Amino acid sequence: MNRTVNGSGMKRMALLNDLSCFGKCSLSVAMPILSACGVETVPLPTAILSTHTADGFGDYVMRDMTDEMEAFAAHWKRLGIRFDGVCTGFFGSVSQLSFARQFLRDFADPSTLVVVDPVLGDNGALYGCFTDEFVTAMRALCADAQFITPNRTEAALLAGCRIDAPVEELLEKLPVPNVIITGVHRGEEIGYCARLNGVWMEIFKPCLPGTLHGTGDVFVSALCGELMAGRAAAEALPRAADFCDRCVRATAARGEAHWYGLAFEDVLKEEREQ
């Protein structure tokens, strides 16, 4: 029997990111959210971790997946698998970033949605595991994307600006068609500042106390779901921001016991029951 791996009619998205087995971030967030959006997900783990890396878990176990990534992609290429979208997150080395660019050359075409969440740093500093060479390589990957979703620190690193540069300057200097800067604080609010095909947009929500892990991953996953459904960027952004805000509030309702990630399952369950 001849079988085809393409043509089912369901949108398919490759997810290049780490898998943290406990805790909610990266692939463990992206796969269920995108599946709920009707998108077929194909994960390609860049690393596998016992937990995510937040304080509270102690010494986590991590395995690099570079060799497996290359072998998996080679198999997919032999099968002729195509993707309607590619979303990338954490990479552990410059060689993995080079692989990601080759992956796009092998599996993407001009119609493929490419979203890069450029994991580099936070709170004004580059993560200690990364170098200036890594930032340069990430900048090159971002140039291949239609959308990037850096936080303010990552936007400054990519733009080559000082960390406290105005958001407007960062948006102006990042040469990607659609840039969404996440986690922007304004008084008692937190939100997103974006340049979407030359149009500026901002969305802010009341900021709740405390630190929540995986918020950016939930937002990016929801954004990809909206974009894969064919919604324009100016419609997809507020819808994804609203979903993320609902997840934050659902998590707050669960209290300290759910400190390790967003309770996005509660929101997906609510939507299913409506």
Q: Model segments located where?
A:
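Short, small-residue alpha-helix embedded
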Residues: P209-A233, L237-R239
